[in-house]
């Protein structure tokens, strides 16, 4: 989570890393107020937060170096005094081209065409309008982590198949 507002970090943590106390609170609230659809997750997400793009880049570079890359980054568009969201995304992708990104913004001061022109067409970018709904964050995190995981598995299988083809080709040449 890359956002200059610490309360946004807490919001993401409450959604993606609910502790047992908050689950009990949700159940009590549901019983009391009749809310039959509280957000629940069995997924285990590792959530790290940065208040500026440069700090996020350092986290991503370290994760890649340690071979524990991030699957998804939720990135705010406005983070004064540092990089804006687009510069942050460009630098994050330079460090890890497989990273899935969700732009989180309350403002529409940058038209989609400008965003697309700057970073190109990609299936690795989604937009989440603030204020966001908990289920939207949870669904985005779940789906994008799954997409990222499947892409890694496919890349591994393609590599294995390529190696197998190379080996068979060498055998046939002999």
Where are these regions (language model features)?
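Acidic, metal-coordinating helix/loop segments flanking the phosphotransfer/catalytic sites
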Residues: 22-72
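Acidic di-acidic motifs
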Residues: 1-5, 52
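Conserved signal-transmission helix
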Residues: 172-174
């Amino acid at each position: 989570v890359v956002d200059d507002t610490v309360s946004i970090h807490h919001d993401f943590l409450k959604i993606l890393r609910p502790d047992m106390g908050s689950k009990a609170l949700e159940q009590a609230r549901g019983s009391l107020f009749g809310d039959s659809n509280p957000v629940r997750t069995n997924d285990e997400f590792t959530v790290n937060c940065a208040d500026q793009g440069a700090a996020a880049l350092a986290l991503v570079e370290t994760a890649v170096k340690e071979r524990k890359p991030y699957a998804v980054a939720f990135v705010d568009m406005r983070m004064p005094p540092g990089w804006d969201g687009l510069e942050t995304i460009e630098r994050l992708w330079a460090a890890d081209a497989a990273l899935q990104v969700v732009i989180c913004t309350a403002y529409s001061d940058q038209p989609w065409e400008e965003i697309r022109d700057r970073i190109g067409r990609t299936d690795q970018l989604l937009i989440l309008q603030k204020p966001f709904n908990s289920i939207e964050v949870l669904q985005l995190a779940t789906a994008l982590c799954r997409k990222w995981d499947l892409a890694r598995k496919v890349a591994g299988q393609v590599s294995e198949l390529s190696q197998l083809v190379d080996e068979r080709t060498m055998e046939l040449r002999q």
